[in-house]
Amino acid sequence: MKRTFQPSNLVRKRRHGFRARMATPTGRAILKKRRAKGRHKLSA
């Protein structure tokens, strides 16, 4: 059986990157929450 995690930097960026977050209202809410919490890293 193959493992479920097959790392790919391209897919990682596209799905969880900053621009992907900014593209949707919910994503912007996530960034807002992470800024409020003081996260050093906002997105992948």
Curated annotation (Swiss-Prot):
Keyword tags: Ribonucleoprotein, Ribosomal protein
UniProt keyword NAD present: no
PROSITE patterns associated with the record: RIBOSOMAL_L34
InterPro entries in alphabetical order: Ribosomal_bL34, Ribosomal_bL34_CS
Record GO cellular component, one term: ribosome
Protein's UniProt keywords contain Cell membrane: no
A molecular function GO annotation: structural constituent of ribosome
Ranges of Basic residues composition bias in the record: 30-44
Region (Disordered): 16-44
Gene Ontology biological-process entries: translation
Family: Belongs to the bacterial ribosomal protein bL34 family.
HAMAP family cross-referenced by the UniProt entry: Ribosomal_bL34
Protein name listed in UniProt: Large ribosomal subunit protein bL34
